[in-house]
C-alpha cells in the first residue's frame, strides 16, 4: 500500500543508540511518501541531530530509574501531565501511527497514542528490554525486537508474545551496503584497528589503546589505528599518542562523520557493545573486540554481543579483563593467521538481520492497511 498522506510520528531520544535506528526508519518512510514528524525532548541529542533531516516537535520528559525519592514520587504526576500534552500534540499532527524507539520521550507519546486509538509500534534495540518498552509493550500494536530476548516468555504475556517480531536493528543504507563486500585480509602486513569510544567517549578504552599500539610494535605486530575518542577525551588521548609514530595512526578524532568509510577501512574493531555499534559491525562483517559498559542498565551491553560471541564472530572482554595481555592474546593470533579474521567476518554477517528497516516498514503498512 502507499503511505502517501499518512502522518507517522517517530519518537526516540537520549542516545545515538535510540536516535540513529529511528533516523534510518524515518528516511525509509519518507521515501515511501509518508509525512514524518519526530517528537523528542529539548536540550537533547535528538534536538541537535534531527532538525537537519526532519521536522521535530518537543515535549518535556524524564526518567525515574536511579533518581531520588522526591522525583520518584512526582514522576507519575509528570507522566500524566506529559501524556495529556502528547494527546493534544498527536491530535494536532493528525497522527495515523506512532513508532517508539525508546528513550524517556517515547513513554508519554506512545501512551497517549494508545489512549486515543492510534496504532503504536515499539522497537527495542537491546538484548534486554528497557523499562520504557516493558511498560509500552502492554499497549503496543506491534512489538519489534532487535535480538532474541532470553526468557521473553517470563516477561511477556501470551498476548504480547503473539504481537512480537524479531526484526534486527535498522542500520543506514551505506553501512548495509558493506554486507555485500567480501573482506580480504591477506594482502597487507598492517592490521587496521578502528577504535570507537562512543559519543561520550570511553575513558578506559581511550587510555589502554595507545599502550596497546606501543606493546604490539615491540612484539612485531604492525597496527594502524583510527581512534574515535568521544568529545570529552580528545586532547587527553592525543597526548597519550605523542610518542607513537604517525605511521601507526590513521586519525584521532572526537567523532567520525562517515562511519561507512571507517568500517570499510578497518580489519578489526575495539568498541563498547551498544546495540547500534554491535549491529553495524555485524552487518558490515567486521570482527570486533567488545568491551561492554560496566554501568549499562541490566548489563544489556554484555547480552547484546552473546550471539556474535557464540558464533565465533567476535570477542567480549569485561572492562576489568581489558588488559594488555588479554588484548594481545586475541590480536596476536589474528595477525598471524588472517584467515581467522576472514572467517569471523563471514560469521558476523550471518548473526544479524540485514533487512530490518524493510521489515519494520512492512509492519507499518500492514497496520495502516487494516486500520
Curated annotation (Swiss-Prot):
Record has Glycosyltransferase as a keyword: yes
Its biological purpose: Cell wall formation. Catalyzes the transfer of a GlcNAc subunit on undecaprenyl-pyrophosphoryl-MurNAc-pentapeptide (lipid intermediate I) to form undecaprenyl-pyrophosphoryl-MurNAc-(pentapeptide)GlcNAc (lipid intermediate II).
Gene Ontology biological process terms, A to Z: carbohydrate metabolic process; cell division; cell wall organization; lipid glycosylation; peptidoglycan biosynthetic process; regulation of cell shape
EC number: 2.4.1.227
SUPFAM superfamilies noted in UniProt: UDP-Glycosyltransferase/glycogen phosphorylase (SSF53756)
Similarity-based family: Belongs to the glycosyltransferase 28 family. MurG subfamily.
Catalytic activity: di-trans,octa-cis-undecaprenyl diphospho-N-acetyl-alpha-D-muramoyl-L-alanyl-D-glutamyl-meso-2,6-diaminopimeloyl-D-alanyl-D-alanine + UDP-N-acetyl-alpha-D-glucosamine = di-trans,octa-cis-undecaprenyl diphospho-[N-acetyl-alpha-D-glucosaminyl-(1->4)]-N-acetyl-alpha-D-muramoyl-L-alanyl-D-glutamyl-meso-2,6-diaminopimeloyl-D-alanyl-D-alanine + UDP + H(+)
Gene Ontology CC terms, in alphabetical order: plasma membrane
Localization: Cell inner membrane
Record's keyword annotation contains Chaperone: no
Residues noted as binding UDP-N-acetyl-alpha-D-glucosamine in the record, renumbered to the chain: 15-17, 126, 172, 199, 256, 275-280, 301
Cited InterPro entries: GlcNAc_MurG, Glyco_trans_28_C, GlycoTrans_28_N
Lineage: superkingdom: Bacteria
Gene Ontology MF, one: UDP-N-acetyl-D-glucosamine:N-acetylmuramoyl-L-alanyl-D-glutamyl-meso-2,6-diaminopimelyl-D-alanyl-D-alanine-diphosphoundecaprenol 4-beta-N-acetylglucosaminlytransferase activity
Membrane topology per record: Peripheral membrane protein
Pathway: Cell wall biogenesis; peptidoglycan biosynthesis
Keywords: Cell cycle, Cell division, Cell inner membrane, Cell membrane, Cell shape, Cell wall biogenesis/degradation, Glycosyltransferase, Membrane, Peptidoglycan synthesis, Transferase
Protein name, entry field: UDP-N-acetylglucosamine--N-acetylmuramyl-(pentapeptide) pyrophosphoryl-undecaprenol N-acetylglucosamine transferase
Organism in which the protein naturally occurs: Francisella tularensis subsp. mediasiatica (strain FSC147)
Amino acid at each position: 500500500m502507499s503511505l502517501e498522506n499518512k502522518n507517522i510520528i517517530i519518537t526516540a531520544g537520549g542516545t545515538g543508540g535510540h536516535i540513529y535506528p529511528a533516523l534510518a526508519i524515518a528516511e525509509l518512510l519518507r521515501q515511501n511518501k509518508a509525512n514524518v514528524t519526530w517528537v523528542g525532548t529539548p536540550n537533547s541529542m535528538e534536538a541537535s541531530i534531527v532538525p537537519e533531516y526532519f521536522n521535530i516537535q518537543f515535549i518535556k520528559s524524564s526518567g525515574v530509574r536511579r533518581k531520588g525519592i522526591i522525583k520518584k514520587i512526582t514522576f507519575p504526576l509528570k507522566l500524566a501531565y506529559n501524556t495529556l500534552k502528547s494527546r493534544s500534540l498527536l491530535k494536532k499532527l493528525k497522527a495515523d501511527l506512532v513508532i517508539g524507539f525508546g528513550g524517556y520521550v517515547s513513554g508519554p507519546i506512545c501512551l497517549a497514542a494508545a489512549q486515543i486509538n492510534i496504532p503504536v509500534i515499539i522497537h527495542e534495540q537491546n538484548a534486554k528490554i528497557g523499562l520504557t518498552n516493558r511498560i509500552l509493550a502492554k499497549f503496543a500494536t506491534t512489538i519489534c525486537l532487535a535480538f532474541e530476548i532470553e526468557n521473553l516468555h517470563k516477561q511477556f504475556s501470551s498476548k504480547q508474545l503473539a504481537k512480537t517480531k524479531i526484526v534486527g536493528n535498522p542500520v543506514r543504507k551505506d553501512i548495509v551496503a558493506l554486507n555485500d563486500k567480501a573482506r580480504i585480509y591477506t594482502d597487507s602486513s598492517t592490521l587496521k584497528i578502528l577504535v570507537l569510544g562512543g559519543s561520550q567517549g570511553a575513558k578506559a578504552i581511550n587510555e589502554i589503546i595507545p599502550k596497546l599500539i606501543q606493546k604490539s610494535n615491540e612484539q612485531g605486530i604492525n597496527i594502524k589505528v583510527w581512534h574515535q575518542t568521544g568529545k570529552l577525551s580528545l586532547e587527553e588521548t592525543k597526548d597519550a599518542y605523542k610518542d607513537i609514530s604517525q605511521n601507526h595512526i590513521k586519525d584521532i578524532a572526537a567523532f567520525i562523520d562517515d562511519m561507512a568509510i571507517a568500517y570499510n577501512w578497518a580489519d578489526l574493531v575495539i568498541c563498547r557493545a551498544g546495540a547500534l555499534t554491535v549491529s553495524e559491525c555485524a552487518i558490515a562483517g567486521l570482527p570486533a573486540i567488545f568491551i561492554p559498559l560496566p554501568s549499562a542498565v541490566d548489563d544489556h551491553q554484555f547480552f547484546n554481543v552473546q550471539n556474535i560471541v557464540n558464533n565465533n564472530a567476535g570477542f567480549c572482554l569485561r572492562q576489568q579483563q581489558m588488559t594488555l595481555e588479554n588484548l594481545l592474546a586475541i590480536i596476536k593470533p589474528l595477525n598471524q593467521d588472517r584467515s581467522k579474521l576472514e572467517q569471523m567476518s563471514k560469521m558476523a554477517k550471518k548473526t544479524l538481520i540485514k533487512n530490518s528497516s524493510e521489515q519494520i516498514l512492512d509492519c507499518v503498512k500492514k497496520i495502516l492497511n487494516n486500520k
